[in-house]
């Protein structure tokens, strides 16, 4: 069987820079370098996404119904749009980082010679009663509780989090408002709108694609490494009893990290083809991409949807990564900048003077086809994915630390490019899209990997970019 080349015919999704399709998000990251017409078009698109303006009969209008030109949108909303995109201070719709909820434990003892007592509803009594409690009935619903020993209580309290920045979707853009979302976790709502953006970016109706392939020649590979941790997923599942609430019938199922693929198959494509969910920490998208290109190269599928969706801006994720010392904190940034006022927009600093990475939410998807089908349909081809390399690190003490697998992965990728394009093309016209996580360890280890691989292939000038500086991790 002739091996087919997987090509990208559509891409889309959303992150802190906005919508990915047609390079809208990329334009936001380089907006300072764009000419005025291109800048104003980008701002107008973001203004619509953020519900600052709307499009009526092909014209931009504000909330009062006044027609706006691109220049007027620029003058009125540019500052607000720029401040409400990319990495920035965490907004209260996600979490109040100055007053994060937690339970404070306090020990209570009675005044000498006096019992400690309180009145409560009978239905609020714990089961079973503590052995040192005495309960006297006051009426049909209330009781008097007397404590004969010291007691420990947990009370609601609030404290500031040391981590205060994240890559958030543009302010005002709510994925769940774009379709009939019922108790869907944020990450799954992002999945629905993200994959829809990618499909529409192909410029070809999905039914037209399906007329050219068999139903089982479509595959979907998508997942999320952190699962769904908001109140509609695992977050609510694990918090409900501790908060005195009830677990719902949806929280467990919707929290699974396989749900992005399931939602795409059931709610968007109606697919009966191959499906799967592969997770691999920061490289989850690439793990799924590897499965996708294997399906096309082997001839098992002709169309593959690949992607991932993460919504980790919640207290649990911030506390967890923060406990590892992995996140950029306000104090760490203050020490780097040498001033009391912190610029949270500069929290993510790949290969620079940094103190940790910056969490971010995003959903990104690509539509792959074999090259023959793409040409038959007249699809726009944005690029090819001939291979994805993933290697383990062998024996090591720290799972998160880099190892020999990183060197093998990068070297194999460069060798593959040399085989396809020739050594001159790689030496003179290639660049590296680095992981660039913005941790002190990464800036050293990844730099060493790139330097040693470049030396092995005699690459003297190798441009390196790290988009996490704009959109977070």
Task: Give a label for each model feature.
Residues 188-248:
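Hydrophobic alpha-helical hairpins/lids featuring a short glycine-rich hinge
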Residues 190-203, 258-261, 288, 370, ...:
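Short, well-ordered amphipathic alpha-helical segments that serve as non-catalytic structural scaffolds
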Residues 190-204, 257, 261, 268, ...:
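Active-site-proximal alpha-helical scaffold in enzymes
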Residues 300-355, 388-402, 436-443, 461, ...:
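Acyl-CoA/ACP chain-elongation machinery
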Residues 47, 142, 147-189, 227-291, ...:
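Conserved catalytic cysteine-centered active-site region
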Residues 195, 220, 285, 292, ...:
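Conserved small-residue
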């Amino acid at each position: 069987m002739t091996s087919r080349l997987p090509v990208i015919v559509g891409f889309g999704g959303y992150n802190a820079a906005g919508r990915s399709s047609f390079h809208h998000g990329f334009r936001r990251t380089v907006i300072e370098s764009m000419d005025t017409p291109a800048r104003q078009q980008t701002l107008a698109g973001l203004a619509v996404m953020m519900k600052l303006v709307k499009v009526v009969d092909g014209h931009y209008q504000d909330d009062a119904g006044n027609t706006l030109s691109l220049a007027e949108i620029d003058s009125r909303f540019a500052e607000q749009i720029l401040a409400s995109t990319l990495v920035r201070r965490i907004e209260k719709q996600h979490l109040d980082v100055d007053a994060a909820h937690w339970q404070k434990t306090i020990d209570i003892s009675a005044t000498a010679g006096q019992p400690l007592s309180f009145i409560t509803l009978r239905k609020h009594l714990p089961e079973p009663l503590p052995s040192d409690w005495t309960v006297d009935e006051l009426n049909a619903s209330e009781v008097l509780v007397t404590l004969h020993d010291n007691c420990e209580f947990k009370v609601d309290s609030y404290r500031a989090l040391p981590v205060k920045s994240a890559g958030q979707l543009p302010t005002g853009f709510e994925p769940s408002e774009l379709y009939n979302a019922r108790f869907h976790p944020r990450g799954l709502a992002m999945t629905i709108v993200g994959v829809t953006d990618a499909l529409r970016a192909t410029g070809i109706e999905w039914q037209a694609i399906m007329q050219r392939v068999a139903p089982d020649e479509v595959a979907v590979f998508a997942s999320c490494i952190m699962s769904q941790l908001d109140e509609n997923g695992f977050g609510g599942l694990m918090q409900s009893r501790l908060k005195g609430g009830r677990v719902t019938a949806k929280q467990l199922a919707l929290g699974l990290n396989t749900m992005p693929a399931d939602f795409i198959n059931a709610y968007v494509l109606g697919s009966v083809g191959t499906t799967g969910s592969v997770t691999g920490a920061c490289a989850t998208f690439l793990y799924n991409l590897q499965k996708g290109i294997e399906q096309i190269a082997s001839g098992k599928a002709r169309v593959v949807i690949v992607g991932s969706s993460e919504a980790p801006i919640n207290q649990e994720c911030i506390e967890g990564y923060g406990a590892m010392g992995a996140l950029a904190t306000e104090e760490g940034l203050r020490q780097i900048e040498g001033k009391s006022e912190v610029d949270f927009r500069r929290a993510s600093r790949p290969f620079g003077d940094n103190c940790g990475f910056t969490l971010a939410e995003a959903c990104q998807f690509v539509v792959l086809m074999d090259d023959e089908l793409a040409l038959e349909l007249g699809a726009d081809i944005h690029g090819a994915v001939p291979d994805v390399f993933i290697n383990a690190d062998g024996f090591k003490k720290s799972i998160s630390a880099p190892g020999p697998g990183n060197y093998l992965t990068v070297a194999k990728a460069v060798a593959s490019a040399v085989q396809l394009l020739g050594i001159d093309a790689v030496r003179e016209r290639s660049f590296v899209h680095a992981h660039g996580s913005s941790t002190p360890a990464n800036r050293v280890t990844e730099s060493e990997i790139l330097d040693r691989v470049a030396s092995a292939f005699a690459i003297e000038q190798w441009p390196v970019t790290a988009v996490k500086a704009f959109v977070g991790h």
